[in-house]
Amino acid sequence: MDALQLGSYTFSSRLILGTGKFSNATVMLEAVRASGAQLITVALRRFNREQAEDDLFGPLSAIEGVTLMPNTSGASTAAEAIRAAHIARELSGSPFIKVEIHPNPQHLMPDPIETLEAARVLASEGFLVMPYITADPVLAKRLEDVGCASVMPLGSAIGSGQGVATAAMIEIIIRESGIPVIVDAGLRSPSEAANAMEMGCSAVLVNSAVAVAGNPPEMAEAFAEAVAAGRKAFRAGLMQKSGSAIATSPLTAFLGAKG
């Protein structure tokens, strides 16, 4: 079985789905089911058992095979992210935490210094830390060294739909990493997800591309199929690129044939 291993957890699906931006909870839940995703990320503010209409914890937990990964979206410092992680673990019981620290709402780029500090503390406390980062190979290695379960470099800015603009740096991270590398943010189409998997990414996280699609459940299914195809292609081994044409059939054998 070609499974995604995160800590002691094993997942057959390599598509991770976010839960923001959907028009309503019903559509979101339909998309989760259609995707077959087993790891679902949820903002801490959506854990609200006292307000059923705002709570996603109960409905998502009821889906068989789903593991929740709370995130610290909204945190602007390591201290805020650590506090959010503690609350999230208490509410959800999940050891996973996606560390998101982006202090500037104009571009939502993750703060590398605060992210590394939060990851160091949370990993030492037994969390399975999944940090959202810029595609920085040096930072990715430092996060691995402090005990993160994976690194999640951005493909492009959150919600931008610009695809994997950081492919060259992500390829370096993949080569040097001893933990799963998961592309997070910026994906617009299933073909981009397939390309990320063909590069050797362990998984992809998708949210906006599914949530704002004309038919979110159908798009979720399309992403699932693309991720599976990309992974299969990576394992099969892609042909090498060439700077010139290479014939697939003999070009000269027939010239010596007698009519």
UniProtKB/Swiss-Prot annotation:
GO terms for molecular function: thiazole synthase activity. The keyword Transcription regulation does not apply. Keywords: Cytoplasm, Schiff base, Thiamine biosynthesis, Transferase. Its EC number is 2.8.1.10. One of its GO terms (biological process) is thiamine diphosphate biosynthetic process. InterPro entries: Aldolase_TIM, Thiazole_synthase_ThiG, ThiG. 1-deoxy-D-xylulose 5-phosphate binds at G159, A185, G186, N207, S208. The active site is at K98. It catalyses: [ThiS sulfur-carrier protein]-C-terminal-Gly-aminoethanethioate + 2-iminoacetate + 1-deoxy-D-xylulose 5-phosphate = [ThiS sulfur-carrier protein]-C-terminal Gly-Gly + 2-[(2R,5Z)-2-carboxy-4-methylthiazol-5(2H)-ylidene]ethyl phosphate + 2 H2O + H(+). Signal peptide: none annotated. Its main location: cytoplasm. It is an enzyme of class 2 (transferase). It is found in: Cytoplasm. Pfam families: ThiG. Catalyzes the rearrangement of 1-deoxy-D-xylulose 5-phosphate (DXP) to produce the thiazole phosphate moiety of thiamine. Sulfur is provided by the thiocarboxylate moiety of the carrier protein ThiS. In vitro, sulfur can be provided by H(2)S. HAMAP family: ThiG. Homotetramer. Forms heterodimers with either ThiH or ThiS. Belongs to the ThiG family. This is Thiazole synthase.
